[in-house]
Amino acid sequence: MAEAAESAPAPPPAEPAAKKKKQQPKKAAAARGAAKSKKPSSGPSVSEQIVTAVSASKERSGVSLAALKKTLAAGGYDVDKNNSRLKLALKVTKETLLQVKGSGASGSFKLNKKQLQSKDKAAAKKKAPLAAEAKKPAAAAKKTAKSPKKPKKVSAAAKSPKKLKKPAKAAKSPAKKTAVKPKVAAKSPAKAKAAKPKVAKAKKAAPKKK
């Protein structure tokens, strides 16, 4: 009995394993949160936001960096954390933006309308060949759909044997020729008989001269 009592208190050391299991879900949740934070935002890029902000402004002298920061902050962009990105974006978008005043990222900026027009034309040229290529398969599909109508020509060729009725007319024409010839032969003996009596009358008139 004493041995059984001594062996009974052994189960308590299993508690730290249970604590480890409870700690694991917390670590997994933290890792998921970090992964979510690393995912890129689905919104527009910094350069796109800058271009939209400059295009929206009506100032003739251009938009300053401070005004750009204000408009970006109003749109929900964290300007303080992404200040370096904002400056890089201004350098990248120099083709679409014209720096009216200042140098570098500091200064005022305007939209480069000529550059935008050239980009629009280039995009339109790219779209035109793609549209032409898309039309070609559609035209080819229409031709293949129309091609099964060709068997109708075979049916027209099958109807052509009806033209063989013409030899029947040729068979009728010899019958007419044979019917006309006997009439001519019948008339010629009658003329010969009528000519003979005239010769006999001439012979009788000769003795009167003596």
Swiss-Prot record:
InterPro entries: H1/H5 (IPR005819), Histone_H1/H5_H15 (IPR005818), WH-like_DNA-bd_sf (IPR036388), WH_DNA-bd_sf (IPR036390). Residues 143-153, 160-180, 193-210 have a biased composition (Basic residues). Keywords: Chromosome, DNA-binding, Nucleus. One of its GO terms (biological process) is nucleosome assembly. This is Histone H1A. Residues 42-113 form the H15 domain. Belongs to the histone H1/H5 family. GO terms for cellular component: nucleosome; nucleus. Gene3D superfamilies: Winged helix-like DNA-binding domain superfamily/Winged helix DNA-binding domain. Coiled coil: none annotated.
